[in-house]
Regions:
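ATP-binding N-lobe of GHMP and related small-molecule kinases
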Residues: 1-106, 124, 128-133, 170, ...
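Solvent-exposed alpha-helices and their adjacent loops that cap or buttress functional pockets
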Residues: 2-4, 41, 140-141, 147-150, ...
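Short, basic/glycine-rich phosphate-binding loops at helix/coil junctions
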Residues: 56-65, 70, 118, 140, ...
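Short, conserved aromatic-histidine micro-motifs
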Residues: 67, 132-151, 275-294
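Contiguous, small/hydrophobic- and glycine-enriched helical/loop subdomains that border
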Residues: 93, 115, 119-156
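Glycine/serine-rich anion-binding loops at beta->alpha junctions
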Residues: 97-126, 144, 250-266
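Conserved, helical-rich catalytic subdomain that frames metal- and/or nucleotide-binding sites
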Residues: 150-151, 155-252, 267-273, 277, ...
Length: 301
């Protein structure tokens, strides 16, 4: 995420992520699922602004995002700000504006990314010197994948997602991202995920090696998402949308997280632009709520 100060407060650009690898190892005693995930942040952002107020109230407004974005205290951004208030005995408030671009029910982590940024923004707005190490457990309370957004590089996660190891920065990777209007319930997708036997689990070893040196072909050959199987059972258009990206020329296509966004891996920016133009000409704009090309969040770009 990118944070900078303004005359009246702080602003953050909060990135989306895609899951290059997602394995479900089973259900835990706490009803969460044990997972292994490799997530890659991409240059596709929501924007959040915080302004300090004297009264200890959290004022929140959201621009964009549609009906799926909570506008009340259940929004993760508001919950994050209130947690900082409570944990650090803050007597000031904040006026918060969230500008949503990352769609909901997409598997792109927009809400979690916003929540992670809100924790950092609240600390800066209220002049709290809180290291990220102390914010990470709070982030995990808000959502299993919130902690990954404290890193601007790929991450590998385990446990229910809270055990995170940052990976080295990658060369730029280009994708075409497609999000249909419909969404899937994460709970429903996990409920349809059948338990596996020992030895059936996939490991991201080859993918991680390819990711470190930007070997696009090998990355494409080793993309994996266990949640595609239950998603396909619940959603009749799954195969059709995936094939649209493949037929347009993507090297490989995968659903991100629990869906319903798909990303198509491309050789480079020019290739991504060609595929985007092809899809734009073939299908009416109303077919998708999002169709765009994006690059990974990389210091090399």
């Amino acid at each position: 995420m990118f944070l900078h100060s303004t005359e009246s407060g702080w602003i953050a650009e909060t990135p989306a992520k895609i899951n290059l690898f997602f394995e479900v190892l089973g259900k835990r005693n706490d009803h969460f699922h044990e997972i292994v995930s490799v997530a890659l942040p991409i240059r596709f952002f929501d924007t959040i602004s915080f302004e300090r107020t004297d009264e200890p109230l959290i004022q929140f407004q959201c621009i964009g995002g549609g009906e799926d974005v909570p506008m009340d205290e259940t929004n993760l951004v508001v919950r994050a700000a209130k947690l900082i208030q409570q944990r650090f005995n803050v007597h000031h408030g904040a006026s918060i504006t969230l500008t949503k671009r990352i769609p909901s029910q997409a598997g792109l982590g927009g809400g979690s990314s916003d929540a992670a940024a809100a924790l950092r923004l609240a600390c800066r707005t209220w002049n709290l010197d809180v290291p990220d190490a102390d914010l990470l457990p709070i982030a995990a309370e808000l959502g299993s994948d919130c902690p990954i957004f404290f890193h601007d590089t790929p991450t590998i996660s385990a446990g229910r997602g809270e055990q995170i190891q940052p990976l080295p920065a990658t060369p730029p990777l280009w994708f075409v991202l497609l999000k249909p209007p419909e969404g899937l319930s994460t709970a429903d997708v996990y409920a349809e995920c059948m338990p596996l036997h020992d030895g059936q689990y996939r490991q991201p070893v080859t993918l991680l090696a390819a990711l470190s040196n930007g070997d696009v072909q090998t990355i494409g050959e080793h993309l994996f998402n266990r949640l595609e199987v239950p998603a396909q059972k619940l959603w009749h258009r799954f195969g059709k949308l995936k094939n649209q990206l493949l037929q347009a020329g993507c090297l490989a296509v995968q659903m991100s997280g629990s869906g319903t966004a798909f990303f198509g891996l491309c050789r480079d920016e020019f290739h991504a632009g060609e595929i985007l133009d092809r899809l734009t000409m073939q299908y009416p704009q109303s077919s998708f709520s999002l169709l765009e090309k994006f690059c990974s969040l990389s210091p090399h770009f």
